[in-house]
Amino acid sequence: MNLPPGFRFFPTDEELVVHFLHRKASLLPCHPDVIPDLDLYHYDPWDLPGKALGEGRQWYFYSRKTQERVTSNGYWGSMGMDEPIYTSSTHKKVGIKKYLTFYLGDSQTNWIMQEYSLPDSSSSSSRSSKRSSRASSSSHKPDYSKWVICRVYEQNCSEEEDDDGTELSCLDEVFLSLDDLDEVSLP
């Protein structure tokens, strides 16, 4: 893929859902096509570099939504955190972000996946299903539930301990480093 010099792909959650995932689910083109299709759940995370355009050590893929997230060496397990994604302008819910981590056997690794999906429209689909059954078979409504965007990265946080013996989370380390930047004066 030939991209201009200085190109950086660092989309927000809203941009991933509205500008990429919604277009993919609606079968609309997205140019430039920077997110490849990949049956992601069959690959171990360390096999992903080189299969997509990556910014730093993170990669983005379109994949089919599935409950089966098992690879040859492990599996992707849910971290139990689902976050709604809202538009910045209207605060309308446009997507859901699910967090998963990769396990080798019973051991959790540092590999994280953020799975972006469009909101479930089952509440409106039950009303429209009666109408659509009467509609002509030539009209096709996109099935938004089939596609997800996955952002995969390896979390590289050292397991430093605080003075009282408790471990710092990655977010704690980020905030502490931002505090350090505040103390630096520019010439």
Swiss-Prot record:
Expressed in root xylem vessels. Expressed in stems, vascular tissue of cauline leaves and tracheary elements of sepals. It is found in: Nucleus. It comes from the Eukaryota. Residues 94-161 bind DNA. Residues 3-155 form the NAC domain. Disruption phenotype: Reduced plant height and length of tracheary elements in the stem. Pfam families: NAM. Residues 118-142 are annotated as: Disordered. InterPro entries: NAC-dom (IPR003441), NAC_dom_sf (IPR036093). GO terms for molecular function: DNA binding; DNA-binding transcription factor activity. One of its GO terms (cellular component) is nucleus. Keywords: DNA-binding, Nucleus, Transcription, Transcription regulation. The NAC domain includes a DNA binding domain and a dimerization domain. This is NAC domain-containing protein 104.
